[in-house]
Curated annotation (Swiss-Prot):
Its main location: cytoplasm. The lineage of its organism: Bacteria, Pseudomonadati, Pseudomonadota, Alphaproteobacteria, Rhodobacterales. This is N-acetyl-gamma-glutamyl-phosphate reductase. The active site is at 149. It comes from Roseobacter denitrificans (strain ATCC 33942 / OCh 114) (Erythrobacter sp. (strain OCh 114)). The gene is argC. GO terms for cellular component: cytoplasm.
Length: 342
């Protein structure tokens, strides 16, 4: 069986990544592509690297007929996404890649994103889309909220450790190095090549990054009490990838065993041998996440290091993984291609 797919926000980086991934999928066919400023253009005009694909032209979203669409990916910015999704047919399956439906508490959304939520009905039904931990809920969901790429990285590192109680919850420091594509495709002065190249810097310092809302929500739920981590992201002059380092209080060997057992049967999460650390180069363009554990020289302290591609496992790949579950397709379909190298 072939399912008809629409992608809204198809002219951005995550939209392009969805097109690339679905092009190799045996059960999905892209029948509609929505955009705003680039509506009316062909995919070849917007993304020359995809010109060999037989795809529809980009349309204004209100021009799309959703009657025969089986599932819609929404890759629009937050705030815009909730407005668009609220107007879609109420029985249409949707995977949202924005931040609009990740936080269950409307007050938390307003705190982190600066505006009141305008689609509370949809927010209440949304399922958090961290696939490996919400698999059963995702299978029956109508609306799935994709995680933030930073939030996904940190949770793959820490969730099993919090559940198992093998780390000090009041002493978690998370440092992430993030590629520039995570900031989107729109023109920003600080993201120009001459402004970004040959250096990197911390941003959203003082634990102010919006993805902390997801960490607070998910880690506190796991622990059964409030958990607040210290988190600082850094912008690096790379196109793809996130490298996360967690500084933790706990026994390194026990931490490694816990992660290895938690992910033993997960097709996309690979825990490296004890003492090895991952590289973003080894997951580039793939839906894989590599995790390593190293003992610190201080007794009772450990490092957990994770690498994933922010556009794939951190966003569009995870979205496709969720869509597979929602449509009762094999979860790994279209996602097992190896990373790009070099």
């Amino acid at each position: 069986m072939t399912y008809s797919i629409a992608i809204l926000g198809a002219s951005g980086y995550t939209g392009a990544e969805l097109i690339r991934l679905i092009a190799g999928h045996s059960a999905l066919k892209i029948t509609a592509l929505g955009a705003f400023s680039k509506a009316g253009q062909s995919v070849a005009q917007v993304f020359p690297h995809l010109r060999h694909l037989d795809l529809p032209a980009l349309l204004q979203i209100d021009q799309i007929d959703f009657a025969n669409i089986d599932l819609c990916f929404c890759a629009l910015p937050h705030k815009t996404s909730q407005e668009v999704i609220a107007a879609l047919p109420s029985d249409l399956k949707v995977v949202d890649l924005s931040a609009d439906f990740r936080l269950r508490d409307p007050d938390a959304y307003e705190k982190w994103y600066g505006n009141k939520h305008a689609a509370l009905k949809q927010q209440a039904e949304a399922v958090y889309g961290l696939t490996e931990f919400y698999r059963d809920d995702i299978k029956t969901a109508r609306l799935v909220a994709g995680t933030g790429c930073n939030a996904a990285t940190g949770q793959y590192m820490l969730r099993p450790l919090i559940t198992a109680g093998v780390i000090d919850l009041d002493d978690i420091i998370l440092d992430l190095k993030c590629a520039v594509s995570g900031a989107g495709r729109s023109l920003k002065e600080n993201l120009l090549h001459a402004e970004l190249s040959e250096g990197y810097h911390a941003y959203a310092t003082g634990s102010t990054h919006r993805h902390l809302g997801e960490f607070d929500q998910e880690f506190s739920k796991l622990a059964g009490r409030p958990v607040q981590i210290q988190f600082t992201p850094h912008l690096i002059p790379a196109n793809r990838g996130i490298l996360g380092t967690g500084y933790l209080r706990g026994e390194a060997a026990q931490i490694h065993d816990t992660l290895s057992q938690a992910y033993a049967n997960e097709p996309f999460i690979d825990v490296l041998p004890f003492g090895e650390t991952p590289s973003t180069r080894h997951v580039r363009g793939s839906n894989f996440c590599h995790i390593g554990v190293v003992a610190d020289r201080q007794p009772g302290r450990a490092l957990v290091v994770a690498a994933l591609d922010n556009l794939t496992k951190g966003s569009s790949g995870q979205a496709l993984q969720n869509a597979n579950l929602m449509l009762n397709i094999k979860e790994t379909e279209g996602l097992m291609m190896p990373p790009l190298f070099p």
